[in-house]
Amino acid sequence: TLALGYDYWWNTRNTKTYTFSPSNTNKEPKIIIDRNYQDRYNDPGSFVKRRNFYGKSILAVNKNNLFLMGDGFRDDGQFPFIDKVDLNSLKKVRLYESSFKDKKEDLLDFEVGNNMILTRIESASEYPNYFFRDLKTDSLTKITDFENPFLSIMDVSKEVIEYKRSDGIDLSATLYLPKGYDINKKQKLPMIMWAYPREFKDNKSASQITQNKNEFTFPYWGSPIYWLTRGYVVLDDVSFPIIGEGDNQPNDNFRKQLVDNA
């Protein structure tokens, strides 16, 4: 039998993933992943699961292979992926990696035996729809046909901007401009900034970009996006890292870093 175990260490932001055999307690657990869980660029993803006869969620194992499904954040964008992992050698083979640069693709489930992915595809103005992606034929089959119900904000300007904090830390945010705004006129408008501070133990993880300009602009309850219809600029999902490297704790300099972020 095969099972996975996880541990987390808050002080270092380290996490480890182990394989072990519940039916053989004499066999030592094996570390298969050892990483900083705040490092999104090197996130290997989550192990694919399936339902057993009893409707319970279990690992999807095929010929001594496990499968990882990841978000695929990189410094040049977001490209979700599926990897096959050999349990003996821990070598990985990439089965699929999204290539969209003008859309956002989310991998929702993977049917291992049939090489079929349930995926969702969207853009900033195209409402998310669901597809089956067949890896054997490299084909997409659309299974929903939802239309954009938020036409009043469909043509707003949206981009992910990058800038530096006073201490050199790279920051990012999603900038929305009202429909019809002429950037060449440099007209000043009121702005709403939507941010929440997050703790990090290293500068590298704090600087990673996890916004996607192709994510559908969805005005959920409580969202600041509604203010675009009233002529406001919206700066959303703003990076607000509070960093404490080494023996320093993030909140030791909370106020100073909070001001620097703003």
Model-derived segments and their meaning:
Residues 1-139, 145-156, 170, 207-208:
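Beta-propeller folds
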